[in-house]
Structures are given as structure tokens and as C-alpha cells.
Design a protein with these regions (language model features):
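Acidic, glycine/proline-rich low-complexity segments that act as flexible tails and inter-domain linkers
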Residues: 1-51, 104-117
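Intrinsically disordered, low-complexity cationic segments
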Residues: 3-7, 71, 89
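Amphipathic alpha-helical segments within well-ordered protein domains
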Residues: 38-39, 56, 73-77, 91
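Immediate flanking context of iron-sulfur cluster ligation sites
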Residues: 46-63, 84-91
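Short cysteine clusters
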Residues: 65-68
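Iron-sulfur (Fe-S) cluster-binding segments and ferredoxin-like electron-carrier domains
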Residues: 71-83, 112
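C-terminal structural segments of small proteins and small subunits
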Residues: 87-112
Length: 117
């Protein structure tokens, strides 16, 4: 495994947590609404939770959101995605986002490895 100087998994989520709690206290209704949307969108359905987390990970890479990458890398790991599945997901994200995907894709892989058993 390659050494890297930036946190991409747990470190990102830990860094964002205090600010997130602070903002949630200021606009609780928005956060409650988002939580309901998230629960509905990620509920088991025709697509299983693992597939939904992999989709979200690809989108997170494409929109260059480090917090989203960390969150959905964790979700992919929790839902038992394999490293090979994550790598293919990253490949699709690179195809859809171009050069930035080659920057954020490795971050996503590092984040997944941080959460994977």
C-alpha cells in the first residue's frame, strides 16, 4: 500500500464532523429533510444498498466532493463492496469526469481502503 500525506477516509469525516454539527444546530430542518431524503434514496429496492453506494461514490468523484467520497467509500465498505468493484466504479467516474477523476479516483480508493476490513 502506498503512503500518502492526505486523509481521504476517516480523517475527512472527522475533520468535517464539528462543522457539520454546528451547522445542523443552526438549520435543523434542512438536516432533518436531508436525512429523510438520504434514507429514502439509499433504502433497499430494485437496486441493493451496495450498488447505490457505488453509484454515489462515482458521483462523489465526478463532483469532486471529498466528504462525499469518504462517506460513500465507507458505505461501500459497510455494504461489502470489493476493491475490484470500487476500482471499476472509479473507472466509470474517470470516464465521465475526465482528468479530475484521475485525481479524485485515487482518493476514493484510499478512502475505501481506510474503511474496508
Amino acid at each position: 500500500m502506498t503512503e500518502h500525506t492526505h486523509d481521504h477516509g476517516r480523517g475527512v469525516l472527522s475533520q468535517l464532523a464539528p462543522e457539520g454539527r454546528e451547522l445542523k444546530a443552526l438549520i435543523p430542518g434542512v438536516y432533518e429533510g436531508f436525512a429523510q431524503l438520504h434514507t429514502a434514496a439509499f433504502a433497499e429496492g430494485v437496486l441493493d444498498k451496495k450498488t447505490k453506494e457505488l453509484l454515489a461514490l462515482a458521483i462523489a468523484i465526478a463532483v469532486r466532493c471529498d466528504g462525499c467520497i469518504a462517506s460513500h467509500a465507507r458505505g461501500a465498505a459497510v455494504n461489502k463492496a470489493t476493491e475490484a468493484e470500487v476500482a471499476e466504479t472509479i473507472g466509470v467516474a474517470i470516464a465521465m469526469s475526465g482528468g479530475p477523476g484521475t485525481v479524485y479516483g485515487p482518493r476514493a480508493l484510499a478512502a475505501f481502503r481506510d474503511f474496508a476490513p
